[in-house]
Amino acid sequence: MLYKYKYIIYKKILSNSIMTNIENANSIIDKEIISFLNKRKNNSIELINYNEVDFTLNIDNDLIIKRIEDINTYRLILDNLIKQPLIKQRTTEWFEARKNRLTASDLYDAIKDNKISDSIAKKKAKIVKDNTNYNAIKALKWGTMFEPMATRIYSQINNNIQIYDFGLICDPNNEHFGASPDGITELGIMVEIKCPYSRKIINDYIPEKYKLQIQGQLAVCNLKECDYIECKFLIIEDENVYIEEFNN
């Protein structure tokens, strides 16, 4: 069985719900941060080849200092998160812990149209039983299968940046709210990955459901930035078809 990923999109979301410039890289050494700041572009996607970056460009030193300060702050937060006892994603314990907690992935359904969802409230309060067989949902199975591949792609494109895996993290101020981020980089940048089963990926667009999910995750982790990644994967059984698709 052969796999091909069609495209990957990187978007930056800040915790104030404003989508900023699309950014394809963060890095741990100052020169790379400088080049990253110089290469930022509004409403566009740009891959940066660090071997071709001109480090002599005139830039705002205050902006550089602020960026480095932010990264250092994020790293301190990351260090604290790593020390916390966490519940590994998709384990029996993880599913049980989510049953009576509102999680970041529930936010859109819980408050869409400015209305509180009675059905979600009843499930979380265990007034009604949630009989959903999540393993039988094709879109969830698809995303779970390809998420590790998308994570590796993201890491490789970003100079093999280390990504820490997290399970359920409970809000320190509200034990009834939690989040399970897909990962957090060594720079303290959150990563949220979607591998849609059938939904078309649209450039410069993040579904509202996922915007709210990311805001919830950032709030729980006390972080401010998230790279949102979407990967479209194709499963191709025939080698000739694979070669044809690859060449296209």
PLM feature spans:
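Active-site region of the double-stranded beta-helix
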Residues: 154
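Short, well-ordered alpha-helical scaffold segments within catalytic/effector domains
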Residues: 147-151, 211-214
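Nucleic-acid nuclease catalytic cores
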Residues: 157-181, 185-248
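Charged, glycine-rich intrinsically disordered N-terminal tails and low-complexity linkers that flank
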Residues: 1-145, 149, 157, 235-237, ...
